[in-house]
Amino acid sequence: MRRLIPSTLTDTRAERMLGALASVVLLVIVLMVVSVVTKAWPSFAHNGLGWFGSGPNVDHQLGDIFNSPADPAHYVYKLSAWPLLYATALITGGALVCGVVFALLAAIFIVEFAPRPLQRVLEPVVRLLAAVPSVIYGLIGVLVLVPLVGNHLISTQRKESVIYVVQLSGNSLLVAVAILTVMIAPIMIALIVVALRAVPVGWREGSAALGVNRWRTVWTISVRAVRPAIIAAAVLASARALGEAIMLSMVSGSVGFAPNPLDGLTFVFEPARPLASAIVEGSEGFSVKPYGETLYAFGAILLLSSLFLSLGAHYAKRPLRKFGLTP
């Protein structure tokens, strides 16, 4: 007869194993952050706060860094990475705002309003879109959206208005945000759909019994209940958006230029170059010490941004719970 192991002993072993695995994961993350920041520190130390400021053409600055002596005592370059930071914030923020709105509306439609046969079609399609490689989205952008914007949305007069500042070709902030929105939306839709399905049916039935219409029930009951899931989906999507490089290199223009809102509508047609694209495009220069340190600095900014976003989302749930806005 088999000897039975007490459930408490089994639970204790499982807890210890999971705790050990969690500790290993935490250690790996800490080592990764320390390694990247350590390798990036010389770039920050050499430039000081000017690293985050604006200055001459950042592409020319990166060229000077590539040709700079390897000895830190003889560094002669300066880097002002504001155009890259600004482009990263614009593209990621724009795509995240558009993506959250689109994903929430799409998830509500799938769960609350779509007929059952249509739901069985839409959900696998959403999961499939979430798994499509970014280079495919980049090809669609290059072959479809970039020519469309360059040939039909940007007039000759608009191109000439900024010709002495930047060249408008279709590779633009608008295309980058549009494609990135389509890339990150399926991830958020899938997570929000799962959360909406977990909302107790009794809550909605109780609201309907009180005479509340269907849309008001969805917004006041279902959406309110899944706010933590929406936050989690947004954080996960923002992490992917921050790290996206290949697709953005293909459609954003890859020019170290800070799009100017004072240019009016032309602003959305101006090219940009986010940090992730700068890392990929300059990856062959890792062997050049000052250039490699600069690329590590770009990576450190992206890594720390993702960590702070995750921490921010975690602490954002506390006031929601305090005021009874989460289950």
Regions from the language model: what does each represent?
Residues 6, 94-126, 147, 313-322:
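Transmembrane-helix boundary motif in ABC transporter permease subunits
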